[in-house]
Amino acid sequence: MIEIFQVKDRKTLKEFVRFPEVLYTNCPQYVPNLRMDEKAIFTTSPCLDYCKLKMWIVKDGKRVVGRIAAIINPRYNKLYNVKRVRFGWIDFEENIEIAKLLLDSAEQWAKEEGMTEIHGPLGYNTWYKQGMLVEGFENVPQVNCIYNYPYYKEFIEKLGFEKECDWVQYKLPPTQGVSDKLRRINDMLLARYPLRVVDLNVIKKQDDLIERFFDHYNETFKRVHNFVPLTKKEIDVLGKQYIKLLRPELNCFVMDDQGRIAAYGICFPSLSEAYQKAKGRLFPFGWWHILRAYTKYSGIDLMMVGADPAWQSKGVSAIFHCHLADNFKGKDLKYSITNPQIEDNSAVKVWDSYQEKEDYMRRRCYIKTIK
C-alpha cells in the first residue's frame, strides 16, 4: 500500500534527496546532483526568504517510490498577476497512482493557500532546473537540466495537465565557426560603436561589475516567459559564486564606453560525465572527477546568452558569437549543447545561422487549473 509523508526532518529530507539515485540506477543518461547541493536547495537557499515550500515522499512499505516539492513564489505571482503554485523535483516509479498522489497533495496544499493554478516542473525561479523532458530521452542532459523517464509525460497528461510552454536545446559542433553574416555584423559593430570585449578576470575581481552584470541579466530576461528577477541576496549568494567559476576562454562580456554590459555569452565545460562518476558525492573522489572535467574538457555547455535591449536590435550578439568561435578554433572540442531556451524567445533564432545543428532535447512546463 502506498502512503504519502511530508518531509519534515533530516531523515525524510535524506530520503527525498537520494530517491532519484535509486530510481535511475540503471539509466545511462541520468546525471545525479551532488547531494550536498541538493540539500542546500531546501535548507539554505536565499529563495526561502520569501517562498513557501512543502515537500512530500511516497512510500510503499519502507521503500520510497516518489517525491515532489511544491513552491509558492509570491514575487512571481505578483509580477504576473496570477495565483500559481509551482511543482518541482518530481520523480516517481512507473505507476500513475503514485504520480496522482504526489500531485494531488501539492494541489490540495495550494488550494488551502488560495492558489488557482499549478504548473511545473519549476524551481523557486529561473535559476533552478525547470521543464519536464518530452523529447531527447536518448541523450545525456547538462548538469543544470532535468532528466526523466518517458512515462512522466504520459502520466502527467493523463492527470489533466496541459502544455504551458516548451524549452528547446540544440547540439552544435563548437569549431564550425560562424556565418559570414554574423562576422560582417561583428566587424561593423566594433568599427562603428565604442564596444569592447572585457577580460573575465577583471569582472571576477570587481563585485560592482558582477552586480552590474546581474542587473543586466534581470533586465534582459524580464520579457522571457516565467522569468523572475533575482533579489540582491540571491545575486550575492548564488550569482557571485557562479561568475567566479567561469573560465575566461569560454566566456565573453561586451561593454560599451559607459561601462554598461551590452551583451554576453556564457559557456561552461561539460561536467555531466564527471557528475555521473561522482554519483552524488563530492568525497572521497567526486571532487577529482569534477575538477578534471573542468580543466580538461571536450564538450561545452552554452549556458546563457543575453543582450541589452538598447543593443539587441543592432545585432550585438554577433560579437560574442564571433569571439567565442575564434576561441574554440584549434581546440579538441567534440560538441556543444545549448542551454534550454523558451521556444518563442527571439534569441533561439540565432542558432538557425549555424549550418550544422541538430535537435537535442525538448522540455515542457505543464499547467492545470486547481478545482
Protein language model annotation of sequence segments:
Residues 1-3:
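Extreme N-terminal starter segment of soluble prokaryotic enzymes
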Residues 146-226:
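Acyltransferase donor/substrate-recognition loop-hinge adjacent to the catalytic core
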Residues 231-235, 258, 266-286, 320-327, ...:
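Active/binding-pocket-proximal capping segment
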Residues 79-160, 278-353:
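Acyl-donor binding region in acyl/amide transferases
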Residues 53, 165-169, 360-365:
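Short hydrophobic/aromatic beta-strand or adjacent loop that forms the aromatic wall/cage
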Residues 20-60, 68-78, 200-305:
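A conserved beta-strand-loop-helix scaffold within acyl/acetyltransferase catalytic domains
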